[in-house]
């Protein structure tokens, strides 16, 4: 199934809706659709690509960096996050983790 993922960041002037299949990582879908998001390891093992889920649901079971508190607060790693519903994600949220 393909979901609509809204990517937002006021500072970076990002407000875009991308289509993301439920078997594609949000970061990869964004890149394919011309939206540059930060990343480093692409393996869910660092925080460069961190975002925050504002609404909707995602699956990031492959990530190994965020702790339960951070995930509970809505943070996600876009490089290993699949959408499981239409969702809205704030990008460039690494600084907000700490």
Swiss-Prot record:
Pfam families given in the database record: Fer2
Domain called 2Fe-2S ferredoxin-type: residue spans: 3-95
Binding site for [2Fe-2S] cluster: 41, 46, 49, 79
Biological process terms in GO annotation: electron transport chain
GO CC aspect terms: chloroplast
InterPro entries per record: 2Fe-2S_ferredoxin-like_sf (IPR036010), 2Fe-2S_ferredoxin-type (IPR001041), 2Fe2S_fd_BS (IPR006058), Beta-grasp_dom_sf (IPR012675), Fd_pln (IPR010241)
Chief site of localization: plastid
Record note on cofactor: Binds 1 [2Fe-2S] cluster.
Any one GO molecular function term: metal ion binding
Family designation: Belongs to the 2Fe2S plant-type ferredoxin family.
Protein name listed in UniProt: Ferredoxin
Species this chain originates from: Bumilleriopsis filiformis
């Amino acid at each position: 199934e393909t979901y609509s993922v809204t990517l937002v960041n006021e500072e970076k002037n990002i407000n875009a809706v991308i289509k993301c299949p439920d078997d594609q990582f949000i970061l990869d879908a964004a890149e394919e659709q011309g939206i540059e998001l930060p990343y480093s390891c692409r393996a869910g093992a660092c925080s460069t690509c961190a975002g925050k889920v504002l609404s909707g649901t995602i699956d990031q079971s492959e990530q190994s960096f965020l702790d339960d508190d951070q995930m509970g607060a809505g943070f996600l790693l876009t490089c290993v996050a699949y959408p499981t519903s239409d969702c809205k994600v704030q990008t460039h949220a690494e600084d907000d983790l700490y």
